[in-house]
Amino acid sequence: MASATFIEVILAIILPPVGVFLRYGLAVEFWICLLLTLLGYIPGIIYAVYVLVA
């Protein structure tokens, strides 16, 4: 289970919405992450890592 989280976090750093999508699908978390990534790459990364680790 820890290796899956590690892969999701790595994907979240490279392309934030992908990591969140793998865990939550098209839920609200994905759309928030996508919006933050479009508005600024760094906020998208921070949010994605926070959502995946929390």
UniProtKB/Swiss-Prot annotation:
Keywords: Membrane, Stress response, Transmembrane, Transmembrane helix. InterPro entries: PMP3. It is a multi-pass membrane protein. Induction: By cold shock and salt stress. Its main location: membrane. It is found in: Membrane. The chain crosses the membrane at residues 2-22, 34-54. GO terms for cellular component: membrane. PANTHER family: HYDROPHOBIC PROTEIN RCI2 LOW TEMPERATURE AND SALT RESPONSIVE PROTEIN LTI6 -RELATED (PTHR21659), OS03G0286900 PROTEIN (PTHR21659:SF117). This is Low temperature-induced protein lt101.2. The gene is LT101.2.
